[in-house]
């Protein structure tokens, strides 16, 4: 049975597990042999032109399968207009490269949904570390988003995302992806093997 960690800042605990390791541009300048996502986090915007140039360079690396984290965060120091510029550019790069978008969103759900309606992406948009309630989860799924869940989650939201819109992650937490799988499968009253099989199918779909 293969476990997929769709978003992490750590190397996998078990070498046989599949992980997409997040890299903050431009701090990761070498190919690693692992799957990677590269992105400009809304907390760490300091030079838009320079960071976007580096993002464009790195997205061409063969180990890069996603752009992110990127997104909108009303608690971040960077102005929302600046965040929007980065986000739109990141979404465009993801479209051109044919890789999925890993999204960080805090208190900007209306703006995020509006962006998706406007940009009409063909590649998957995945909201990482989703902790919102079932109502918000259902709204996002109806708009075509995928949700990724980690150590903390709302069971009702997990049920909304199951089966075809759900992923699992460890993010920056000191937790094994296998524990996340177990917790999510228990919340759905499913056998671990059934849960893992569906997540594997979801990964193949993106």
Descriptions of predicted regions:
Residues 1-206:
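Mid-domain alpha/beta scaffold segments of enzyme catalytic cores
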